From Swiss-Prot:
Record organism: Escherichia coli O81 (strain ED1a)
Pfam families (UniProt xref): DAP_epimerase
Reaction equation(s) it catalyzes: (2S,6S)-2,6-diaminopimelate = meso-2,6-diaminopimelate
Positions of disulphide bridges: none
Protein's name according to its UniProt entry: Diaminopimelate epimerase
Annotated site, Could be important to modulate the pK values of the two catalytic cysteine residues, chain positions: H159, E208
InterPro entries the record matches: DAP_epimerase_AS, DAP_epimerase_DapF
EC number: 5.1.1.7
Residues the record lists as binding substrate: N11, Q44, N64, G74, N75, N157, N190, E208, R209, G218, S219
Active site: C73, C217
Task of the protein: Catalyzes the stereoinversion of LL-2,6-diaminopimelate (L,L-DAP) to meso-diaminopimelate (meso-DAP), a precursor of L-lysine and an essential component of the bacterial peptidoglycan.
Recorded superkingdom: Bacteria
SUPFAM superfamilies: Diaminopimelate epimerase-like
Length: 274
């Protein structure tokens, strides 16, 4: 099986063309491939499939290292767009894809960045899903014998965003896994730790559902900005500084889609016998 290794701000992916190759990924195979010592190693596996709708270009599937399938990955979406152009699967700059959650448009810019229409953030608790009676800008949760104030949103996947004074000293490794599997998140959640530097600039670390802390989480950056705007903390255009680098997020508010712009890097191509 041929594959490519790619990354978006250090969030790394194994990308496989299932348009021209006949491949099947069981959870066991994904876990084996994800092993950084015995396999290929990655944060997530991205699979390019033929579209289910003639109006679309591709179907986009995402798997975590534990073999579970997820509906959204912003950094992966940028790598997906670069991959299909690099491999000659399309020459379009505007690429329309379906995911387990819906549809997305990926745009490759003139300077080889990728702009992703992430859709409109959804704050309805049932959409996240999150156990709450109504939409609130801030929820109060109990976790690890602490009272946590957080914002909750779906970007096609569940996100919880906590404001911290300094991301360098935030309890990502201890509080992250506790909140990820908190009973109020029946499908678990991605946990963002957000430091507001100013209205146009935040620093962010994300403990990802099924993957742990990563160098960057695209949908997590989108979620943090959406929550920050909802809470009146941020402007419509925000620079997000992650451990792996920078993303630019723009959202005009309710009724509008949110846009993420950032890099996608091809590292190498490989072949593995399954």
């Amino acid at each position: 099986m041929q594959f490519s290794k790619m990354h978006g701000l250090g969030n790394d992916f194994m990308v496989v063309d299932a348009v021209t190759q006949n491949v099947f990924f069981s959870p066991e195979l994904i876990r084996r491939l994800a092993d950084r010592h015995l396999g290929v190693g990655f944060d997530q596996l991205l699979v390019v499939e033929p579209p289910y709708d003639p109006e679309l270009d591709f179907h986009y599937r995402i798997f975590n290292t534990d073999g579970s399938e997820v509906a959204q990955c912003g950094n992966g979406a940028r790598c997906f767009a670069r991959f299909v152009r690099l491999k000659g699967l399309t020459n379009k700059r505007d690429i329309r894809v379906s995911t387990a959650n819906g549809r997305m448009v990926l745009t490759v810019t003139d300077d080889d960045l990728v702009r992703v229409n992430m859709g409109e953030p959804n704050f309805e608790p049932s959409a996240v899903p999150f156990r709450a009676n109504k939409v609130e800008k801030t929820y109060i949760m109990r976790a690890a014998e602490q009272t946590i104030l957080c914002g909750v949103v779906s970007m096609g996947n569940p996100h919880c965003v906590i404001q911290v004074d300094d991301v360098d000293t935030a309890a990502v490794e201890t509080l992250g896994p506790v909140l990820e599997s908190h009973e109020r998140f029946p499908e678990r959640a991605n946990i963002g730790f957000m430091q507001v530097v100013k209205r146009e600039h935040i620093r962010l670390r994300v403990y990802e559902r099924g993957a742990g802390e990563t160098q960057a989480c695209g949908s997590g950056a989108c979620a943090a900005v959406a929550v920050g705007i909802q809470q009146g903390l941020l402007a419509e255009e925000v620079r997000v500084e992650l451990p792996g680098g920078r993303l630019d997020i723009a959202w005009k508010g309710p009724g509008h889609p949110l846009y993420m712009t950032g890099p996608a890097v091809h590292v190498y191509d490989g072949f593995i016998h399954l």
